[in-house]
Design a protein with these regions (language model features):
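Residues that flank catalytic or metal-binding motifs in active/ligand-binding sites
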Residues: 4, 33-35, 66, 97, ...
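Acidic, metal-coordinating catalytic segment for phosphate/diphosphate chemistry
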Residues: 1-42
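Residues immediately flanking
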Residues: 11, 51, 145
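Nudix hydrolase/Nudix homology domain
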Residues: 60, 72, 101-204
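A glycine-rich, hydrophobic loop/mini-helix early in the fold
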Residues: 34-69
Length: 204
């Protein structure tokens, strides 16, 4: 069985090493590289998911469409497309960089810590209905973006990273279709080169 590893980074996003994903999330979680993705359709709806109830971090919590970790040496955009396929059965053709410099740290009630440099991407998808993988996602629903935005702004229960991301995304404008692209020069250093984040995989 192949051990899934995450990339450990410093504050600037320089690679420090790797660690098994199964051991990285503790009460002293080191800073590591991750990503978040928001899937939109042409009707300005966003795919909102509920995390599987057996997950070790924030089980059963409502959150954005998809999250994950690129493996050592894996292109960041490819990692986003890989997780969309694995978690939601979505075969997307490309990604759009939205928040290149997003970083967060959050602590669960049991003391387990999330501590990530976590660039945020957007994907437009109008294909077949998503097929959530029950190992990762307990449900997935299309929700009008403005409705979800209001829910979060009014204190609705969502994951801590989703709440912080939504505050930043709200500043980009009312319609996701009109948001400006993020500045790739603000990405963590380890994935700043276009060959390290622009996806090489495509379903198109």
């Amino acid at each position: 069985m192949v051990t899934e590893e995450v990339v450990l980074v410093d504050d600037a996003g320089r690679k420090l090493g790797t660690q098994a994903k199964s051991t990285v999330h503790t009460t002293t979680t080191p800073l590591h590289l991750a990503f978040s993705c928001y899937v939109f359709n042409s009707k300005d709806e966003v795919l909102v998911t509920e995390r599987a109830h057996h997950k070790s971090t924030w089980p059963g919590v409502t959150t954005n469409s998809c999250c994950g970790h690129p493996g050592p040496g894996e292109n960041l955009g490819d990692a986003v497309l890989r997780r969309l396929s694995q978690e939601l059965g979505i075969e997307a053709g490309g990604v759009r960089l939205l928040l290149p410099d997003f970083r967060y740290r959050a602590v669960m009630e049991n003391g387990i810590v999330e501590n990530e440099l976590c660039p945020v991407f957007g994907v437009v998808y109008d294909g077949p209905a998503p097929k959530p993988n029950p190992e990762e996602v307990s449900r997935a629903d299309w929700v009008p973006w403005q409705q979800f935005s209001r829910l979060v702004a009014e204190g609705g229960a969502v994951s801590p990273w989703c709440r912080e991301q939504m505050e930043r995304l709200h500043e980009l404008g009312e319609s996701p279709a009109r948001w400006p692209a993020g500045d790739p020069d603000a990405l963590p250093i380890v994935v700043r080169d276009p060959q390290q984040w622009q996806p090489t995989l495509s379903s198109e």
